[in-house]
Amino acid sequence: MAGGRRGPNRTSYCRTPLCEPGSAGGAVHGGIPSVSGVRSRARSSSSTGLSSPPLATQTVVPLRHCKIPDLPADRHLLFELQLFFCHLIALFVHYINIYKTVWWYPPSHPPSHTSLNFHLIDFNVLTLTTIVLARRLIGAIVREASQGGKSSVPHSLLLVATRFAVLTGTGWSLCRSIILLFRTHSFFNLLFLCYPFGMYIPFLQLGWDFRRPGLSHMPNTRDLASMDRGSKDYLHVLQHILRHHMPSAEPLPTHACCLSPDLIRSEVHYLKLDFNWRVREVLLSSMLSAYYVAFVPVWFVKSTQYYDKRWSCELFLQVSLSTSVILTQHLLPARYCDLLHKAAAHLGCWQKVDPALCSNMLQHSWMEECMWPQGVLVKHNKNVYKAVGHYNVAIPSDVSHFRFHFFFSNPLRVLNILTTLEGVLIFYQLYSLLSSEKWHHTISLALILFSNYYAFFKLLRDRIVLGKAYFYTAVPDCERKLN
């Protein structure tokens, strides 16, 4: 024939779906759902970089999750006390920077018998700032004293007295400071104290969605039904602002290790919202603490008082960064990051490919009821995607699923970021300490460094232990026997 030569009859490939809809809908982790065979044409160009699925039957094998050791963690009340102590150190060194004296001068110069000009300090501002910095500690004490349980009558009376004393003392000190500040300062100056809260209200009102899915298998879903879009008001927004700045002692979510695509996507959606909630709590708490440590004291300084503005800005950055690292380490512990990693492993990921490079390869129509093995090509929204994960139930066009898998596919990613940030902060503080020439800068950096060493030690300890645990799990059994 003029058009080409004749050859033997070619085998026709049946383009059947990869899996039957609903085949993995009710499977549990112990079962192995079978998936129909996947065949591709033999003509695969080596220049495309795409490998077609094997000719044998594809089978979804259950994942083997790593069992991480139980790392010691601080109690919630002890952690809040440690965080408050770090904030007090930062506030103390900032007051040294503002109200320092020249007490070492000889009597011929204007001497001072103290290292600080205490008569220039506004103790009402100091009291208000201390209460704001202690808000999480106060909430933790009240929560510990409010926990019910079978206890003796004297113990119950002691808890009630403790709760009453803490709330009464805090409320009286706060009201007294605010009243005295209204007498000595203008209303415009007092608005500076409420500036962070004024920014949160429109930000929360317009930008955040507090709705959460009602998942029955999640034991500790926060009740956010009152924050529906149709019923948002400023009272509810203020309530959730306070929740962001109060300590969160809720238990960690649990991992529903199942092979149902719908349940896996629902679990990932819930964990994504829970993770965003924890990150928002970290950001809001750290920014508010740094604001009251670095900016509020200098705003109420008299016009004749000199202070180092550059040091105040550096202190704001250092306090916000160190507080963010400490809070993130507490709210995102190793067990929680391992939970997110397991969910990301079940979710999988898709990589968008050029349709021209895989036109001669078998392509399936993506179905949400199916669980797709690694290396399969699917069509979704007129695009072609390749399965990247061990098995994949993510929506190919959903960017949030891609980000979730990218960020949590490595279980040590969050811990590596925190360790790097804390290490860079400590290195910068050590460099500033060695190059400082002023006595108050030396004292300030030395005290702040001591408050960061403990957090860095815990991060390094967790990183070393978890790194060895995940590495031991990743090594095949045959290599372990050889070693």
Swiss-Prot record:
Pfam families in alphabetical order: Tmp39 (PF10271)
InterPro entries recorded: Uncharacterised_TMEM39
Glycosylation sites: 9
An example Gene Ontology CC term for this record: endoplasmic reticulum membrane
Membrane topology according to the record: Multi-pass membrane protein
Subcellular locations according to the entry: Endoplasmic reticulum membrane
Gene: tmem39b
Family: Belongs to the TMEM39 family.
Regions that span the bilayer: 76-96, 114-134, 158-182, 187-207, 281-301, 414-434, 440-460
Signal peptide: none
Statement: the UniProt record of this protein carries the keyword Cell cycle: no
Keyword Transmembrane: yes
Keywords annotated in UniProt: Endoplasmic reticulum, Glycoprotein, Membrane, Transmembrane, Transmembrane helix
First-listed, main subcellular location of the protein, grouped into a coarse class: endoplasmic reticulum
Protein name: Transmembrane protein 39B
Annotated function: May protect the cells against DNA damage caused by exposure to the cold-warming stress and facilitates tissue damage repair during the recovery phase.
